[in-house]
Each structure stands twice: as structure tokens, then as C-alpha cells.
Amino acid sequence: MEFLYNLHSGWHVDQAIVTEEERLVVVRFGRTADRECMLMDEMLASVAEKVRNFVAIYLCDIDEVPDFNDMYELNDNMCLMFFYKNKHMMCDFGTGNNNKMNFLPDDKQELIDIMETIFRGARKNKGIVVSPYDYNHKRPSD
């Protein structure tokens, strides 16, 4: 996991988001010991080298660094959030939550496609993009 960096404080999270000027910043917020979180980390590690030219990937344990739990509503055991030039990027996944991705994509290529779509939209100054895949079926039941 040489392309995945752990962030151990709120300051480190801020610096990761603020200082990256060219690439999309993807932060996996979650509980590191959770099964779904481990699966996402494994998927991120497997795509990290392929996307390293346009994506910087970071991991943040929400129990170790609770600073953003309220601000970003980090109630899930795992979620991805996307930032570009210090701006939160939103993506319409068809789940009703455009702020974060709180589910596992079906495969690695889907994850790469999502990152690429968000990156391309961000470079065009779009605040929200539409996911290339519809995840309406992954919507949490009420």
C-alpha cells in the first residue's frame, strides 16, 4: 500500500486537501477494522498505482481522528470523499447522497471510472458530476 497514506490528525487531513493542486484528493474515512472498510482499502490499494497521475489517496480512521465526523456527517463505517483544489467534489451516484460514496463499487474498473469522471468534472470547475454508474440499488433502506 505504498500509494495509500494514513492521516493521523485533523491537521494532516487539512494539509492533504489544501496542498494538492493538480490531482483529485480521495480520502477514505472509516473504521479501519470494519470489513467493508478493509475491502475498500484493498480496492484502493489495487488501483492506486494506475491512478497516481491524477489521484492522491489518503486513509483516515474516524475513531482516531474524529475532527470531521460532524462536519462531513461521517456516520458510516466507510466512505470516500473527493476534493479538488481544496473544494469538496460531489457526485450523484443515484443513492440520494451526493456528498460521499458510502458503498463498495462492484469492481476496480468502476472505481477508476468514478475517480476519472470526478477528476474530469473538477477540472471543468463543476461542483457536482454524475457517476458513470447508477447505484440506486445500493441505496440504504429506511
From Swiss-Prot:
It is found in: Nucleus. It comes from Candida glabrata (strain ATCC 2001 / BCRC 20586 / JCM 3761 / NBRC 0622 / NRRL Y-65 / CBS 138) (Yeast). One of its GO terms (cellular component) is U5 snRNP. Keywords: Cell cycle, Cell division, Mitosis, mRNA processing, mRNA splicing, Nucleus. Belongs to the DIM1 family. Component of the 25S [U4/U6.U5] tri-snRNP. Gene3D superfamilies: Glutaredoxin (3.40.30.10). Signal peptide: none annotated. SMART domains: DIM1 (SM01410). Its main location: nucleus. This is Spliceosomal protein DIB1. InterPro entries: Dim1 (IPR004123), Thioredoxin-like_sf (IPR036249). GO terms for biological process: cell division; mRNA splicing, via spliceosome. Essential role in pre-mRNA splicing. Also essential for entry into mitosis (G2/M progression) as well as for chromosome segregation during mitosis. The keyword Metal-binding does not apply.
